[in-house]
């Protein structure tokens, strides 16, 4: 699965956007994945909860919320290899750290590849590939 820098949020409900990752996901699965990406409390506080409309291109939500919804959708999919392009963009430090911990947990179930310009110290085992020049491809 792939999560790019451009996030696709559709003019549908939160549940419908999430189920694009797994059409047969039940409400309990949706709540679990929302908890994983740090949006469960936000969704619970919405009057329509899972039926909250997100607006055209996600106009009813913030950029950080859109990124987390797209990530939640990806985590619902059965894919074992995830490629995330700048998944921490637009997130504050606390949100980045929470997302990092969630991704590390998910990595135990498959392969996680993160493309980023920003690295920070972590006690998690990771492999880093640094490209020496911008036009070098691996």
What are these model-predicted stretches?
Residues 15-55, 101:
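ABC ATPase nucleotide-binding domain helical subdomain, centered on the C-loop/LSGGQ "ABC signature"
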Residues 78-80, 110:
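A residue-level structural signal marking coil residues immediately N-terminal to beta-strands
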Residues 93-94:
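Helix N-cap at the start of a conserved alpha-helix in ABC-type nucleotide-binding domains
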Residues 82-86:
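Catalytic Walker B motif of ABC-type/P-loop ATPase nucleotide-binding domains
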Residues 65, 71:
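Hydrophobic anchor residue at the start of the ABC signature
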Residues 2-8, 22, 57-58, 117-119:
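ABC ATPase nucleotide-binding domain signature
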Residues 102-116, 120-123:
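Conserved catalytic loops of ABC-family nucleotide-binding domains
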């Amino acid at each position: 699965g792939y999560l790019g820098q451009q996030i696709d949020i559709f003019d549908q409900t939160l549940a419908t956007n999430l189920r694009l990752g797994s059409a047969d996901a039940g409400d309990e699965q949706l709540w679990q994945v929302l908890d994983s990406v740090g949006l469960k409390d936000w969704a619970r506080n919405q009057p329509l909860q899972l039926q909250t409309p997100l607006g055209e291109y996600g106009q009813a939500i913030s950029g950080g919320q859109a990124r987390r919804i797209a990530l939640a959708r990806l985590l619902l999919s059965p894919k074992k290899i995830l490629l995330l392009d700048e998944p921490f963009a637009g997130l504050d430090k606390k949100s980045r750290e929470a997302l990092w911990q969630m991704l590390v947990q998910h990595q135990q179930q498959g392969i996680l590849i993160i493309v980023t310009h920003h690295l920070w110290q972590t006690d998690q085992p990771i492999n880093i590939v640094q490209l020496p020049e911008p036009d070098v491809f691996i």
